[in-house]
């Protein structure tokens, strides 16, 4: 840790976090770790963090395309269909993937969540959808069965079970 305040920025509470996603790049040093929540997920920031020889860890946003191939023509993977079909008994799935239309390489980790956690996530999502006059798709309900993370930290540095633990530390840092 640098142990110093590098930047202070006040914004409208309704401003999107993505607009600030690149602000950290000039401050990065080799081997720094950038922990991000969904609001800061921008593919360009992931590229620039890696270009600085730094590390990133973020949750995966549902709308981001994921592919097993770097080819831009390769189809996006339907994760909620892929995992049960190809990894029916795995509690943690660890894959090298390419994300977004730009096919940014990264490591995807999917943790199957315990039933009680899945039920609570679905209950909250259903409540939120009702408030907005929407319905939850089955695909989104299935998505809520997993904790999904993307990182550029290799498996040799962080074994699969470590990634979720490190991400949870984010709340202790903030």
Predicted stretch roles:
Residues 1-173:
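Single, function-defining residue in the core of a domain
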């Amino acid at each position: 840790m640098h142990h110093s305040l590098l930047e202070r920025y006040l914004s409208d509470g309704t401003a999107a976090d993505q607009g600030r996603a690149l602000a950290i790049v000039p401050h990065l040093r080799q081997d720094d770790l950038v922990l991000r929540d969904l609001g800061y997920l921008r593919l360009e920031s992931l590229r620039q963090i890696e270009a600085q020889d730094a590390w990133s860890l973020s949750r995966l946003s549902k709308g981001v395309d994921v592919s097993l191939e770097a080819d831009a023509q390769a189809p996006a993977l339907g994760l909620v269909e892929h995992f049960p079909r190809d990894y029916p008994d795995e509690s943690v799935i660890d894959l090298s993937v390419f994300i977004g239309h730009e096919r940014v390489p990264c490591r995807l980790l999917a943790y199957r969540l315990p039933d009680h956690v899945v039920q609570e996530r679905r209950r909250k999502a259903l409540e939120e959808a009702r408030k907005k006059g929407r319905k939850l798709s089955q695909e989104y309900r299935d998505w809520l069965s997993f904790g999904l993370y993307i990182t550029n930290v290799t498996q040799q540095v962080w074994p699969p079970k470590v990634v979720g633990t490190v991400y949870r530390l984010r709340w202790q840092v903030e």
